[in-house]
């Protein structure tokens, strides 16, 4: 990165991460600058005549008034190339492993804008030849980045022309020029990376309708509140309701090709847990370590607040880059509330007029900007890819009426509200089936009918209806007890208990239960439905509920999630046969 010596400003005010400087008339809005003697990384966020306001992405302790501001001549941007997958970055794409080697556990000020490894040599397969016409987005080389991710090197947005020179396939680092393209009088030498400004969405050819689900292996999501590839999801919940655990489960088991996990303003221990767990976990699709498809962006609560604001954009830009190669990417942002708090803090230091609860008036548009970068798209190189955004929201006191939750709700397609009462009752995932919803149910209907069963929609609605009825009946039970209810309503309570404990509750630490294939999920629901239909028939014949309630069958239905292996679900058939024969015999006895 070259500093432009001709452009120099002077610091005239310091307020935490916000710097005021003069002599800035030739600088540009959103330009990345180097601040002070330590060359701290900053970004111009307000430019008025000669005065500029700069937000600094590093600790500003020790800066003095009168120190210089240098120009880099480019916006805050990322280096996009091989070496991103399996790596862990801070909020502005500086690799934490490398920083650890330099400064031993602490991020020193002025460490510079280091990024992906420039010296590592990659096995590069060049897929173009002299005379080929190239346009933006075309693939001109391929690198096997991990054993499951093939990194496609694409033509940058400003390059268009004919290939005039090509190196042979072989070992190259990301800085070496491997292809030369001529466009009229312009000659472009292409290497293995490109730069992209974080706040600008990457271009696409077309947005496509959402029609494929993101299979997560979590029963409540896949069966009741499905997520579409390219969709947007909010997971709001108070302290201790399991937001991070739910995000970890989605990052581990969802069938996206690549996961970008952003720890935005959360505890450092949680990122440590990800770093310790993911390399040990095996991806069920590829039988290799989960780190081979994961990018981690760690911007913990004690890191500079301005970098927290940038980390969300860093994550989504990396996700879009891999989407452009034709991959399905899922991005986990934990938590967007901390990001909104960073906006609030910077807004306060800028002395902007606060809106509701002190958040800036532009909070809704910033949240929309982020979620609108999701989607299932046709790329410039005619491949299809998707970015699915799953954002955790941490409302203070589990108050869902606060601004971040309410504004997020406006822009997402699925809302998975976590419930304190469920969490305190140790029902995890604590997703409340009464307040949660997914608008993707309708969009994904065709896929579910084709790939699971023709009765799946009917079955899902029937089970949800039982859960809603049980909620109404609980009000009566609390007042007068269960015994006064008629038997058909008591049956609803029993079936809902099986559904809640045996189906909706899922153990993230159990080998069989942490991830459940969709076929087993469907068969489990069918077994519960078979029990309900047979038991309902008995109730209508006047058979007392005490006879209908068979503890052995109840136990089998509740424990089938643990006892029946995911690879061989024939055990569910045995349970169904037991249900059918027991209730047929019961009906025969009462007919006599």
Swiss-Prot record:
| Matches recorded under Gene3D superfamilies | 2.40.30.20, 2.40.50.100, Bovine Mitochondrial F1-atpase, Atp Synthase Beta Chain, Chain D, domain 3, P-loop containing nucleotide triphosphate hydrolases
InterPro entries named among the record's database cross-references: ATP-synt_VA_C (IPR055190), ATP-synth_a_Xtn (IPR031686), ATP_synth_asu-like_sf (IPR023366), ATPase_a/bsu_AS (IPR020003), ATPase_F1/V1/A1_a/bsu_N (IPR004100), ATPase_F1/V1/A1_a/bsu_N_sf (IPR036121), ATPase_F1/V1/A1_a/bsu_nucl-bd (IPR000194), ATPase_F1/V1_b/a_C (IPR024034)
Its BP terms in the Gene Ontology are: proton motive force-driven plasma membrane ATP synthesis
What is a single Pfam family found in this protein's UniProt entry?
ATP-synt_ab_Xtn
Any idea of its EC number?
7.1.2.2
Q: Which GO terms describe its cellular component?
A: proton-transporting ATP synthase complex
Q: Which CDD domains match?
A: ATP-synt_V_A-type_alpha_C, V_A-ATPase_A
Protein name in UniProt: V-type ATP synthase alpha chain 2
Q: Which organism is it from?
A: Clostridium tetani (strain Massachusetts / E88)
């Amino acid at each position: 990165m070259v500093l432009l010596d001709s452009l120099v400003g002077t610091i005239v005010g310091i307020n935490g991460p916000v710097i005021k400087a003069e002599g800035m008339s030739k600088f540009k809005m959103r330009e990345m600058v180097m601040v002070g003697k330590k060359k701290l990384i900053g970004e111009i966020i307000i430019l008025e005549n000669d005065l500029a306001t700069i937000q600094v992405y590093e600790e500003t302790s020790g800066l003095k008034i009168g120190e210089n501001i240098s120009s880099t001549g480019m916006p805050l941007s990322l280096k996009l190339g091989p070496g991103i997958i399996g790596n862990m970055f801070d909020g502005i794409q500086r690799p934490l492993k490398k920083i650890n080697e330099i400064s031993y556990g602490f991020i020193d000020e002025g460490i510079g804008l280091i990024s992906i490894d420039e010296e590592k040599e990659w096995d590069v397969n060049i897929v173009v030849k002299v005379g080929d016409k190239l346009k933006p987005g075309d693939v001109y080389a391929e690198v096997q980045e991990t054993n499951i991710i093939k990194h496609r090197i694409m033509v940058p947005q400003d390059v268009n022309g004919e290939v005039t020179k090509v190196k042979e396939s072989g070992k190259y680092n990301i800085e070496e020029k491997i292809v030369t393209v001529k466009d009229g009088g312009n000659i472009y030498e292409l290497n293995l990376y490109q730069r992209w400004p974080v706040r600008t969405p990457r271009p696409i050819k077309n947005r496509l309708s959402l029609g494929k689900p993101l299979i997560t292996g979590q029963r409540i999501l896949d069966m009741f509140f499905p997520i579409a590839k390219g969709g947007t999801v909010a997971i709001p919940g108070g302290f201790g309701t399991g937001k991070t655990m739910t995000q970890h489960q989605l990052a581990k088991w969802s069938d996206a090709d690549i996961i970008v996990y952003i720890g935005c303003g959360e505890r450092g221990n949680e990122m440590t847990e990800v770093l310790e767990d993911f390399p040990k976990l095996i991806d069920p699709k590829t039988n290799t370590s989960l780190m081979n498809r994961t990018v981690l962006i760690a911007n913990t609560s004690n890191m500079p607040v301005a970098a927290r604001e940038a980390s969300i954009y860093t994550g989504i830009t990396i996700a879009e880059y891999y989407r452009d190669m034709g991959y399905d990417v899922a991005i986990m942002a934990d938590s967007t509330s901390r990001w909104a708090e960073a906006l609030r803090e910077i807004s306060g230091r800028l002395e902007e007029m606060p809106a509701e609860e002190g958040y800036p008036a532009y909070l809704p548009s910033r949240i929309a900007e982020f979620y609108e970068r999701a989607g299932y798209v046709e790329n410039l190189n005619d491949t299809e890819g998707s970015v699915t955004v799953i954002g955790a929201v941490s409302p203070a006191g589990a108050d869902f009426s606060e601004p971040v939750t309410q504004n997020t709700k406006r822009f997402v397609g699925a809302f998975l509200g976590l419930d304190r009462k469920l969490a305190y009752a140790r029902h995890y995932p604590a997703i409340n089936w009464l307040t949660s919803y997914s608008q993707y149910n309708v969009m994904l209907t065709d896929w579910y009918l084709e790939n699971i069963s023709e009765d799946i929609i009917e079955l899902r609605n029937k089970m949800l209806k039982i859960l809603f009825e049980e909620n109404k009946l609980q009000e009566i039970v609390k007042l007068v007890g269960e015994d006064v209810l008629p038997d058909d309503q008591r049956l609803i309570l029993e079936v809902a208990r099986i559904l809640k404990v045996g189906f909706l509750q899922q153990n993230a630490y159990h080998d069989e239960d942490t991830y459940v294939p969709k076929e087993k999920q469907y068969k489990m629901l069918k077994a519960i439905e078979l029990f309900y239909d047979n038991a309902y028939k008995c109730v209508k014949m006047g058979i007392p509920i005490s006879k209908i309630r068979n503890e052995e069958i109840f136990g089998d239905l509740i424990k089938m999630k643990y006892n029946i292996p995911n690879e061989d679900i024939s055990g569910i058939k045995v349970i169904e046969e037991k249900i059918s024969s027991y209730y047929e015999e019961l009906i025969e006895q009462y007919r006599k």
